[in-house]
Every structure is written in C-alpha cells, then in structure tokens.
C-alpha cells in the first residue's frame, strides 16, 4: 500500500511539473502507471535475473551478435512490435503510441570492453554479483527489458511511441557506431527524446563529453642495436612524444583530459625496432578546450618525429628517416543542455518524488549523438551499485533500493511520451 501511495504522489508531481507542460501529463489517478511502478519494485528479482543471464552471453567489441539475438528474443517475447536487428546490429522494438505524442527512445548498449575469450560467468556472494560487464551495461539492458515488461503487463497507453533498444558499439573503438547509424538512417528525424540507461547508480548526465582518439605509429627500417646504431629509432620518437604529451597543461574547468593508454613496439632488447605505436585519448565537454588539447598533441607528435630524425647525423641516418602515421580511431561529439531543458527537469522531478536527489553532469555515452544533433537526451544510471567498471573484477551490488533505477526510467519515459 505504501508503494502505491508513493507512486501516486510521484505521478501527480510529474503531471504538474513545469518540465512536462508541453507534454501529455501523466494523470495522478492512472492505475496502469501505479501498477507498473509497483511491478518494478516487487519484480526486482526478475530484473536481476535478466542482468545475470545477459552478462553470461559474451559481447566483445564488434561481436555483439549472440547477445543481440537473445535480446531480440526477449523483447519479442514481451509482445512488442516490429522487433528486429538492423544492419549494424542494433536491436529495436517498438511500442506504438495511441496518438501523435513525442517519440521516446529508451536504450542500453549490448557491447562490453572485454575481448573474446573473457570468462563472463557470474559469481554471487550475497547481494554482490561479479563478472565482467555485469554493470556496464548489462544493468542498463536489464532495466530496458524491465520497463518494457512493466508497460506491457500494466497496460499503460502512451500517447507517443516508445522504442526499446539494445545498441552496439558504445564502448571504445565502437565509436558510438550503433547510435550514429540509428540517428543517421532508420530513426533520422523521428526521435523527440532519448534516454540511455548506462551503468548502475542513480546519476544523470545531461552533457556530452567529447573525445578524440588516435593510433599513432612511428616507422623506420630498424636494425641491430649495435650494428645499426646511429639511425633514428621509432621507440625513441615515441618516448619523446609521450614525454611532451605528459607535460601538457589543461584547464580544470571545463575538465579536459588526455591519456596515452596503449603503447606497442620492439622485438628484442638488442634490436632497433622497425615501428612503435601508441593510442591516445583526449576528452572534454567543451568543444574549444578539446580542439586546443588536440592541436597541442598533434604539434608534439610532429615535433617528436622531427627531433628524432634530427638527432642522428650522416648519410646513413638520412637514408633511414622515420615516418609517422596518425589513424583516427574515435571521434565523439561534445554537447550540452541546460538544467531547464524539459528532459532534464523531468528526470530531476521524477528522482525527487522517488525520494532521492541527484545532480546533472557530463559523460561520454550513447547520448552524445542525439545531444550533438540538438535532440534532447540524457544518460541515467540503472540503480544499485557498480564497482570496478571495465575491469575483470567488475561487480554489481543489488542494494535495497536498486529497483529505483527501473522506476526512474519508467517515470521519465511515461512523462515524456505522455500517458492516457
């Protein structure tokens, strides 16, 4: 009974919140909405089981197909319409609206950061579940399923159409390829609001942290460390570049970062390597700051090449000059929204009435794409607690209020799409 009273209060608040004045309000006496919220609490075990089972289906970068097929099956089993996998691997399910209300997307990403062969067996210790990917983003996928199920079973009628999506390519070199495809083709011009459920917790990101990522390679003929001594060395050039990058000064606000995350090169201790490479990541929510650090890094890369080639005189060295290639492995757009934006105010109002507070921030997620296109979008957490994201020791804690994640997502979707 207490849950039903809380749900009614939440629904009433959302109905009158300034954030949704332009939307079809969620009526405070809507029994279907209250039933959906109650179900998401009482069926928390069901949601958790989806999370466990999906985690144990490997989904390495660019290899999400097995998990996608299972996700398609589960969405179809809920009775959603037009459930299909598009040409890049996104799983899309449609729940048609009753009128001409806003179109809302609720999405979680299928891919993980872990390579093929990673053991993804879930181990349970009390309320703690441990496995690579259990939080990022199998929690999000489970929440999307839970909300879709609650809407179906409670019989909620939304004015606008709601799409439930499991998308590919969110992580790393996936470069948001699933979202780029969706917003560039099948759903171009059709989406009014986008919500990504990514990771655990109850945070909200309304800003898009942009990033530039490069794979940089220095190449030369290489040779014996003693016999060929005196020719330019790709590893030395790489070292010069890394040292220069490490000394770059960046602003604290807006937070701007850089990182050399991977280095490769060399065959033996007594060889001058024929090549050396590194992967560089730089991030900022501000386009100007990102462009500035990008310019500094590119300058340093060229200076390192010139310095290493100039270091060694003579015709032998001149014939063995190094070259450099810079391959782009990821570009994520920046973007921002005011806290007064309807989608943000709706999310904050829903959180408040569910009894928790949260603050807006910025992150790099699927929401980057719609935000950069001027489409209102946010990333929210799926409830519970995540530890050790992107590590083999990743874990998810099923906290006493973890059901708030699915409830929050459901309220936001209902308020934005409108409920009859």
Model-based region annotation:
Residues 1-8:
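Bacterial N-terminal signal peptides that target proteins for export
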Residues 8-17:
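Bacterial N-terminal signal peptides
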Residues 20-60, 208-210:
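N-terminal hydrophobic or amphipathic helices/low-complexity stretches enriched
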Residues 23-31, 35, 235-420:
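Metal-dependent amide/peptide-bond hydrolase catalytic core
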Residues 49-102:
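A non-catalytic alpha/beta surface segment that caps or lines the substrate-entry region
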Residues 94-139:
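Catalytic-core environment of secreted peptidases
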Residues 120-131, 219-223, 389-393:
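Glycine/charged-rich beta-loop-alpha catalytic/anionic-binding loops adjacent to active sites
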Residues 128, 133-211, 251, 270, ...:
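Acidic/histidine-rich catalytic neighborhood of metal-dependent amide-processing enzymes
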